[in-house]
Swiss-Prot record:
Keywords for this protein: 4Fe-4S, Iron, Iron-sulfur, Isoprene biosynthesis, Metal-binding, Oxidoreductase
Pfam family membership, one: LYTB
Assembly: Homodimer.
Organism this protein belongs to: Citrobacter koseri (strain ATCC BAA-895 / CDC 4225-83 / SGSC4696)
Protein name according to UniProt: 4-hydroxy-3-methylbut-2-enyl diphosphate reductase
InterPro entries referenced in this protein's UniProt entry, alphabetically: LytB/IspH (IPR003451)
Name of the gene: ispH
Binding site for [4Fe-4S] cluster: C12, C96, C197
Pathway linked to the protein: Isoprenoid biosynthesis; dimethylallyl diphosphate biosynthesis; dimethylallyl diphosphate from (2E)-4-hydroxy-3-methylbutenyl diphosphate: step 1/1; Isoprenoid biosynthesis; isopentenyl diphosphate biosynthesis via DXP pathway; isopentenyl diphosphate from 1-deoxy-D-xylulose 5-phosphate: step 6/6
Top-tier EC class: oxidoreductase
């Protein structure tokens, strides 16, 4: 059985930054550090940080006065931000800068009184945070997930209308929704390119190349990870058996028993140690040496807040 590795895969710059913010805060200030929502959607990462003293909460009211609070990589609404400001808290923002870019687009539209349409998945924390940047009662903020949603959407003024997208969507699905928006609302304005982030796009491109060669595709990522789900869906659309797994223990021998080639990739919030464990398990099941495919090189780095720019080793 051949093992192929998608490239790129795993951590993106936004996830690296968010995890570093929590790790550095723990090193500098000590436990406990409060984090609103899972800092990234990966069970292994969250459990590891919890063991070191991070406390994950959903409501600001759960945080005691005087505590350190970190916003997750998915971002928060202005209402949540304002609630935190009103409390005696030290706040660090781990929102991915590419999500912040979308927040700024929505805030600008709100100030101008333009109605805005967000393409995204209802209930996802990034969507809730982005929708929560709009506050102009004269305008409106709407959420659509599919071309059918676009057909049933009513707006107040088609002449002052813009759209944005969640950063972790399917590139293909989003293109279909954008086409539907432009057909329904010819004057709609959008970003020069959609807001889907470089890492999401690159990993979908990589899994497409992987699925062209593999019989079975394993995507390392948690069930609540939007970008990981999109990777598994893309491989399935290409007619391949694809499975989303948290770690190597999820692998069922029957999945790969007849496979000549198994492809492995990882969502943007999945650490490489999980991928290495998956490779080891596949080798136990008869796999050979893991062969990485060629792919786009990623050199993007997002800095942590200056207050947290320390060598963690110096404070341990």
């Amino acid at each position: 059985m051949q093992i192929l590795l998608a490239n790129p895969r795993g951590f993106c710059a936004g996830v690296d930054r968010a995890i570093s913010i929590v790790e550095n805060a723990l090193a500098i200030y000590g436990a406990p550090i409060y984090v609103r929502h899972e800092v990234v959607h990966n069970r292994y990462v969250v459990d590891s940080l919890r063991e070191r003293g991070a406390i994950f909460i959903e409501q600001i009211s759960e945080v005691p006065d005087g505590a350190i609070l970190i916003f997750s990589a998915h971002g928060v609404s202005q209402a949540v931000r304002n609630e935190a400001k009103s409390r005696d808290l030290t706040v660090f923002d781990a929102t991915c800068p590419l999500v912040t870019k979308v927040h700024m687009e929505v805030a600008r539209a709100s100030r101008r009184g333009e109605e805005s349409i967000l393409i995204g998945h209802a209930g996802h924390p990034e969507v809730e945070g982005t929708m929560g940047q709009y506050s102009n009662p004269e305008g409106g903020m709407y959420l659509v997930e599919s071309p059918d949603d676009v057909l049933s959407l009513d707006v107040k003024n088609e002449g002052k209308l813009s759209f944005m997208t969640q950063t972790t969507l399917s590139v293909d699905d989003t293109s279909d929704v954008i086409d539907a928006l432009r057909q329904r609302f010819p004057k709609i304005v959008g970003p020069r390119k959609d807001d889907i982030c470089y890492a999401t796009t690159n990993r979908q491109e990589a899994v497409r190349a992987l699925a062209e060669q593999a019989d079975v595709v394993l995507v390392v990522g948690s069930k609540n990870s939007s970008n990981s789900n999109r990777l598994a869906e893309l491989a399935q659309r290409m007619g391949k058996a694809a499975f989303l797994i948290d770690d190597a223990t999820d692998i069922q021998e029957a999945w790969v028993k007849e496979a000549k080639c198994v492809g492995v990739t990882a969502g943007a919030s999945a650490p490489d140690i999980l991928v290495q464990n998956v490779i080891a398990r596949l080798q136990e099941l008869g796999g050979g040496e893991a062969i990485p495919l060629e792919g786009r090189e990623e050199n993007i780095v997002f800095e942590v807040p200056k207050e947290l720019r320390v060598d963690v080793r110096e404070v341990e």
